[in-house]
Amino acid sequence: IHNPSLFVYDGTYPYRGMLNTIKGRDEIGKIWVRRGTFRKGATRIPMDSIEHFDVIITPRDSLEEAKDDTQEIKAQVFDCEPIIYASEDDLNSRQHLRSRLGIPMDALVCYVQLGAGNINDIESDISITVSELAKYEDVYTVVGESMLGQSLEISGPRVRILKDYPNSVYFRSFDFAIIAGGYNSYHEVIRF
């Protein structure tokens, strides 16, 4: 039997089954890395979920909004910088990915990443995006394919597929990006 000493949940809202599993397990530490904050005046703050945790870590957002996280709770609350999966030292040169994918150094390069496609069908959105970008002869499109999703059926003379993780290590190669507004992608694009 596995007997963990620490449980860490990284997400927006804890699932009921998970909460039921950790409820009453006083022998383990319970940490919630709660991305996103509750807006001031929010009426749907999951107090019953918060009460299951000893520590709540709240990564700050790039845009500071008025928030009201001062609810009386028993958990310790810590703020930290936005969580990203690469550092400046990890970034490859502008030429690295362009050479690897056969993209001219003087081309405009757009990075497209619209999610894993596990929740929403993204293939048609990606097809439309790639078709629109193809109208510009000086633009190459690099589609970031999720490690979690199925392979995309996208091709074209100036289209490249990048299936790697984290793709943010290649951000110096791109001139602009079209991305899904997820926490990780947003903060990595803003940072790099």
Question: Which residue ranges define each predicted feature?
Answer:
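Alpha-helix C-terminal capping/helix-to-coil transition sites in glycosyltransferase folds
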Residues: 2-3, 52, 172-173
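Short N-terminal targeting/anchoring amphipathic segment
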Residues: 2-14
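A nucleotide-sugar donor-handling region in carbohydrate enzymes
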Residues: 34-42, 49-114
